Each structure stands twice: as structure tokens, then as C-alpha cells.
């Protein structure tokens, strides 16, 4: 085996995925892998110019579309080996639907949303079941409350019987499906031979990649028991989810470029940071970071206002402790919490939400693992770092002592 060479970029690719798994602890590793590598692929080229990926592509290129639209989403140990053998699917032996996704879609071109809303009425009981089925769907995680409500309104229930085909290999994508209950086989036809490459068991989702990239269904999904699915039509899926993902990427990239400490990053480094940034919402008065605690993240304010306070050594509160004194206010586009990452000391101040606040959060462990030691990157702008120290705390202040 000594003649086998590791392809360039493979180690970094797998390290990045491994770090995200350890950080987020997803319940479904395969579903998480599909989401992670889909985002990675989207970041490399606009959706409108992405080629139809073939599973023969190397890891040095945009990853393939795995699965029934996501064969890799299935549970079981066999799919990873079998997926490597998959080639562009041959047309299904079943009748093809009329083409519904031949046109190119570019979310950047649709600035105004004038399409009528799709609403499928539901009983309270149906709504509750739908919310429960969707709570762990990764594609819905970044939607705000209004967007999620629109998605839930547009979803429709589909009851399936055993042996019913939900989607057929080679067909055009028309709906995205979330599984509420039931078991389903994932079948792939190659060289006129059909084989099972995985199963779904009362959870999961499938069908999104054909809608996102205008590619035919890569597998057939057959119900092996009676079950229930929730479908989302292609138009709503692309209007809300695809467009939202594109906007989120642009917004995150824009925020990163606006942070002085990160302006010197290469484009490739910024793209990696986009992948490790999360989003958190804080209510009025909620404490975001605490003075004296170990630093593990830094924050960029997406919306709202944040108050920065330190404990006074000369003023006491009513409980006899050191009173907190406000030293700064941060607003949209500004950031806080990065100094502790550079000094590797406890938090020098506390931060509180003033009104409702939405922050982009970068985890220092993922940051360091993906891009190298945090200090190496921050040193590129060390003069700005020193300027921030003087501005916020005074040149003679020891940050380590402030955290005690």
C-alpha cells in the first residue's frame, strides 16, 4: 500500500469536518456530513454555475451529490463504500415526471420576493407533528422565525403505503421531504442492476440537492412500511432556503471582512471561517460573557447593542461585592471578546445584551484547528490589537488581573 498517495487537501478536508462534529455533536453524522460538505461546495462557486457533480470527482474538487439526492444520508456502514462506485445515474425504469427544474437558479438575482405564499392549512395536531419532525433538520437551523413559519405553512402531509415509490432515480426534483414516521429503502440502479445502499428509519430528510443544483434524482426511495412524510415544494424551498443560505454566507463574509483583526486573512481563510461561525440570540439583560471566565469564543454583533462592564475595585454593590462599571458600548458590526483569545487569559470584562441582540459567534477551538494557532493570525494586526488595549483598558492595565 506504500504506492498510494494521499490526495492534496484530503487531510485538511477531513480535519475540518471532524472538528465540526466534535464541536456540534450532531445526532446524525451522515446527515451532518451532507450539510457540511454541501455548504463547502456552495462556498466554492455560485449555485447558478455549479456543474452537475458526479460521484467520480476527487476530493480536491467540489464533493459529489451523495445519495437519493442524498444517498449518504442513510444509516448503515455500507453506503460510504458503495457511493464510491456510483457514476452518473442512468434514467430510471419508471416514468419520468415532467421537467420542473431545468432553469438555472441564482438567488442573487431575485432581490424582491413577489411570489404568492404557498399555504397548506393544518390542524393544531398536524402542526405539532410537523414541528416535531422538523426540529432536527439542519437545513432549517439558520432560518429566522418568520422564514421557518413560512416553510411550515407551505409543507404538506403525504401518507405513503408499503412498496410505494416516493421519488425515482433519474426524475427531476419537485419536492423536499422530511420523514415523520416509517421506514424507507434507498435504491440505486447501475448497469441495469438495482441494489439497496441504505435505509431511513423514522427520521431524516431527503431530496434537497436536486432542488438546489438542478440535478436528477440520484436514487429511488421506496417505503418499506406505512409512513408519513412532510413535503415542501420546489419553489418555496428555493425561495426561502436556498436564498437564505446564500444571504447568510454573504452576510457572514461581509462581517468577517469588516473586522479589522481579520482583514489580512486570505480569501480561502475567510471561507473557512464562514463555515465555523454560528449565530446566537440573546434577550435584553442576558449576560453573554462573564469576567474571569475562560475565553472560548469571540463575538460579532449582527444586530442590537452590547454593554461591556468590568468590576470596580473602588465601588461596591448592595451585596458587598465589586460593582460593575460600564466601559464601552458595542453596536452592529462591532465585535468583542477577541482580546482574551490573543492573551490566553480569563475574560477581562463582562458583556450584556441591551435589548434583543443577535451575534455571530466563532469558537476558538474550531478557529485554531482550521486556520492554525489563533495568535499567528492575530499577530498580523498586532498594532491594532495594542490600540484596542489602550482604548478599552489603558496601557498599564493587566488583563489577567482584571479577570480575577
Swiss-Prot record:
The keyword Signal does not apply. The keyword Acetylation applies. The modification Phosphothreonine is found at residues 54, 215. One of its GO terms (cellular component) is ciliary base. It is found in: Cytoplasm; Cell membrane. Residues 2-138 are annotated as: Dimerization and phosphorylation. 3',5'-cyclic AMP 1 binds at residues 139-260. The inactive form of the enzyme is composed of two regulatory chains and two catalytic chains. Activation by cAMP produces two active catalytic monomers and a regulatory dimer that binds four cAMP molecules. Interacts with AKAP4 and CBFA2T3. Interacts with the phosphorylated form of PJA2. Interacts with MYRIP. This interaction may link PKA to components of the exocytosis machinery, thus facilitating exocytosis, including insulin release. Forms a complex composed of PRKAR2A, GSK3B and GSKIP through GSKIP interaction; facilitates PKA-induced phosphorylation and regulates GSK3B activity. Regulatory subunit of the cAMP-dependent protein kinases involved in cAMP signaling in cells. Type II regulatory chains mediate membrane association by binding to anchoring proteins, including the MAP2 kinase. This is cAMP-dependent protein kinase type II-alpha regulatory subunit. The gene is PRKAR2A.
